Design a protein with these regions (language model features):
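A short, basic/flexible loop-to-alpha-helix module at the beginning of a structural domain
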Residues: 89-100
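Ferredoxin-reductase
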Residues: 1-82, 139
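Short, conserved phosphate/pyrophosphate- and ester-handling motifs at nucleotide-, phospho-/glycolipid
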Residues: 32, 112, 201
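Phosphate-handling active-site elements
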Residues: 125-131
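Histidine-anchored nucleotide/phosphate-binding helix
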Residues: 113-125
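Short, compositionally biased
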Residues: 49-61, 98-110, 215
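Reductase modules of NAD(P)H-dependent flavoproteins
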Residues: 131, 135, 140-228
Length: 228
């Protein structure tokens, strides 16, 4: 399948939000899933997976990506301009809201925020009787991707609690500090009837899972997706 780049914008240091128009495909995916972009680069066909950051609907989908200057794929992606086409496959993935939907804690670092943005935009309105808490951790304030969108969702939906945290905060920062693991345990308190969704770098996800196991959370309530 093919998609045409419609527009893009910078959302962080070396991080870009891309909006594509699919050609001959309706964006039929479940929030939380990902697409695989493919491109022939030199003698190799390179494939990279990116979580869909937009809700389903129409023939458009959005992705966010970091530029890795010495990488093989991201420099090509960042060279795309509106009107350029790219091949993709999918959607794939089982990192989606479980049924029946329970109160949920979502834990993200970096571009791990992508599937949660899709889930929240698409599902908050459908589940007003369920509480959703998002704990989003980055080093610097500028790394809080989609911060404005998430603040608006927290304002518009009483059942959504947005908790950003910085590990290297400026003196002017008045919000939470430290790693997401501690804030997740704080949000969970003594409850064990909550689903915990975790997305981010492998080290964080593995550590978060270990801590949840230590406090006795049923492994079936731990839903995770990790990347290197």
């Amino acid at each position: 399948m093919k998609a045409r780049l419609a527009t893009y914008r910078e959302i962080g240091l070396n991080t870009r939000h891309f909006e594509f128009e699919a050609i001959g495909w309706t964006a039929a995916f479940v929030p939380g899933q990902f697409l695989s972009l493919t491109q022939q680069i030199g003698e190799d066909e390179i494939t990279r997976a990116y979580s869909i950051v937009s809700p389903p609907g129409g023939n458009r989908f959005a992705l966010c990506a970091n530029l890795v200057p010495d990488g093989r794929f991201s420099p090509f992606l960042f060279d795309l301009r509106p009107g350029d086409e790219i091949a993709f496959k999918g959607p794939y993935g089982a990192f989606i809201l479980r049924r029946p939907v329970s109160d949920s804690i979502m834990v993200a670092t970096g571009t791990g925020i992508a599937p949660f943005r899709s889930m929240l935009i698409a599902r908050l309105r459908d589940h007003p009787d369920r509480q959703f808490t998002l704990i989003f951790g980055v080093r610097y304030e500028a790394g809080l991707l989609y911060h404005g969108d998430l603040l608006r969702l927290a304002r518009d939906y009483p059942n959504f609690d947005y908790r950003p945290t910085l590990t290297r905060p400026p003196e002017t920062w008045i919000g939470r500090t430290g790693r997401v693991q501690a804030h997740t345990l704080e949000a969970l308190e003594d409850r064990r009837d909550v689903d915990v969704y975790v997305c981010g770098l492998r080290e964080m996800v593995d550590d978060m899972r270990a801590k949840l196991k230590e406090i006795g959370l049923d492994r079936k309530r731990m839903i995770y997706e990790k990347y290197d």
